[in-house]
Amino acid sequence: MSDGARFYRWDDLPKEQLTEKLDRRFITGERLMLAHVYLKRGCQVPRHLHENEQATYVLEGAMLFKLGPNGEEERLLKAGEVLMIPKNLPHSALAVLDTVSLDVFSPPRQDWIDGTDQYLRQG
């Protein structure tokens, strides 16, 4: 491979269990992070916001997102659908079904890298 290019196979990456209902694998580059997120039905991601742009692509299952300071906008995201979340927009999510999503963050989530994402680890 050319200088700097890296190859990964998802199944070869370690899967981090955050709660009984939430696991993830992620790859970090210089300016973006790519993550497989595995949510069991009923998994709740608490309302939070971050300095990172986020794209969530649901590969399997369905998730209900609540967007805005009070969760006033709801979006049901099903397999094959993508939600773009701008930086600093408060949001939460509920896995309506067992779900696998592909999440992209730019820049990478430092709290995920260093394990200080406590809001995700409560459950």
Label every PLM stretch briefly:
Residues 66, 82-83, 110, 118:
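A beta-strand edge to alpha-helix "cap/lid" segment located at domain peripheries
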Residues 49, 55-79, 89:
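A short beta-strand-loop-beta hairpin characteristic of the jelly-roll/cupin
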Residues 32, 52, 60, 98, ...:
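ATP/adenylate-binding site constellation spanning eukaryotic-like Ser/Thr protein kinases
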Residues 15, 26, 34-36, 55, ...:
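Conserved hydrophobic/aromatic beta-strand scaffold that supports enzyme active sites
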Residues 7-14, 92-123:
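Double-stranded beta-helix
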Residues 35-49:
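Conserved short histidine dyad/triad with adjacent acidic residue
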Residues 40, 77-90, 94:
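Conserved metal-binding segment of the jelly-roll/cupin
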Residues 1-31, 35, 117-123:
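A short, N-terminal "cap"/entry segment at the start of jelly-roll beta-barrel domains
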